[in-house]
């Protein structure tokens, strides 16, 4: 049986992650409040940010920026976009 969570991003009951994606309290919070769909959407957006903004994951400031953007993304706040990116029409 699939575990469901009340997704913070989409504000509905959706299938949850199989395990925490990070160690510690942050990973547990994501595990308990973020759906598989929201996590997959974040991973796509994160990849775009890393590539378009040329972020270096060895750089602590770049990791800190990405962490802050992840928090905004899941909270439904305004978050950084790749400049010039237009999402495909659905």
Curated annotation (Swiss-Prot):
What InterPro entries does the entry give? Fe_traffick_prot_YggX (IPR007457), Fe_traffick_prot_YggX_sf (IPR036766)
**Per the UniProt entry, what are the Gene Ontology biological process annotations, in alphabetical order?**
cellular response to oxidative stress
Q: Which keywords appear in this protein's UniProt record, sorted alphabetically? A: Iron
Q: Name one GO molecular function term.
A: iron ion binding
**Iron as UniProt keyword:** yes
**GO CC field:** cytosol
- Give the signal peptide as a residue range, or say none if absent: none
Role, per record: Could be a mediator in iron transactions between iron acquisition and iron-requiring processes, such as synthesis and/or repair of Fe-S clusters in biosynthetic enzymes.
The protein's name? Probable Fe(2+)-trafficking protein
Q: Which organism is it from?
A: Pseudomonas putida (strain ATCC 47054 / DSM 6125 / CFBP 8728 / NCIMB 11950 / KT2440)
């Amino acid at each position: 049986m699939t575990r469901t969570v009340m997704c913070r991003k989409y504000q509905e009951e959706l299938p949850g992650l199989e395990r925490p994606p990070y160690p510690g309290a942050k990973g547990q919070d994501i595990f308990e409040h973020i759906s598989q769909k929201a996590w997959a959407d974040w991973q796509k957006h994160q990849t775009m940010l890393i590539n378009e903004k040329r972020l270096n994951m060895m750089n602590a400031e770049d990791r800190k920026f990405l962490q802050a953007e992840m928090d905004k993304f899941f909270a439904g706040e305004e978050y950084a976009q790749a400049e010039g990116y237009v999402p495909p029409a659905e």
